[in-house]
C-alpha cells in the first residue's frame, strides 16, 4: 500500500471544496493508502480552519481534526539535517514529517515544494498527479 503525506493545503481544499483533494481524502477514508500526519500539520490545519474568513464553527473544526487523526498515522518528526533551499521556511515541518514517515508521496499544492527536485527518498506531486499515478497502478 502506498505511504503518503498530505500537505495542509490539500486538507484545506478537500474540506472546503470538491475536486481532486477531496478524492484523495476519500482514498484515506477507504483505506486504499496509508497516510501519515504530524502534530505540526494538525496544528497548522486547526489554525487555518479557525480563521474567520472560513466561517467554520469550533465544533466543526474539532470534528475534522478528530476524523483526520482517525484516518492517519501520527508520527513524530526530526529536524532536517540538510536544509533544502526552500523559500518559505514555514514549509520545513512538512518535509520533516515526510522524511520521518518514510513516505512514497508528498501530496501538495505548494509551488515551492513541488519545485524541489533534489529529493530522492519520495516524490512530491500535486493532487492531480497523485490520482493519475494511482489510476495507473
List the predicted regions and their residue ranges.
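Metal-dependent nucleic-acid phosphoesterase active-site entry motif
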Residues: 1-19
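PIN/NYN-family metal-dependent endoribonuclease catalytic core
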Residues: 6, 18, 22-52
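Residues at secondary-structure transition points
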Residues: 19, 36, 59, 63, ...
